[in-house]
Amino acid sequence: MSNFVFYDFETSSSNKQWGQIIEIGAILTDDDLNELDRFESRSRLSPGIIPEAMALIVTNTSPKKLKTTNLSHYEMIRQFVEKLKDWGKVTFIGWNNIEFDQIFLRNTLFQNLEYPFNSTTNGNNEGDILNLARAANL
C-alpha cells in the first residue's frame, strides 16, 4: 500500500486564483497511520497580496504576523516541493482538499514554475475526507 500525506493549508483568501498559501501543515504516515515525518511552514505575505478579513479571522493571524515571518512564499513552496519529492509516491488526504486545497496548490505550483499536477500523477493519488463524510451521511 501507499503512504498517506494528511495536509491542510491556511490561505490569505478564499479566491483560489489570486490568494496565497500562507501556512502549510502536512503529516506523512504509513498505511497503518503511524507518523513517519511532518512538514510545517509559514511564509510572509507576498507583495501585492491583500488578505481577506475573513481569512485572517479563520486562520487566526494578523497582517503584522504576515509581514514579519522570515520565509518568503517562494522559499516555503520550494521546501514543500522538496519534501514531497523526498516522500515519494503518496495518497494526499485532506478536508475539502479536492475543491479547495488542491486547486490552490496547483495554482501556486504553476505560479512558482513547478509541476502543478503532482498529486494525481507519477503514482500519486488524492482523497477527500469531506466526500467520505458526505457518502457516509447518505
How would you name each of these model-derived features?
Residues S2-T108, S119-T120:
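Conserved non-catalytic scaffold segment of RNase H-like nuclease domains
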Residues N124-L138:
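Short alpha-helix plus adjacent loop in nuclease-associated cores
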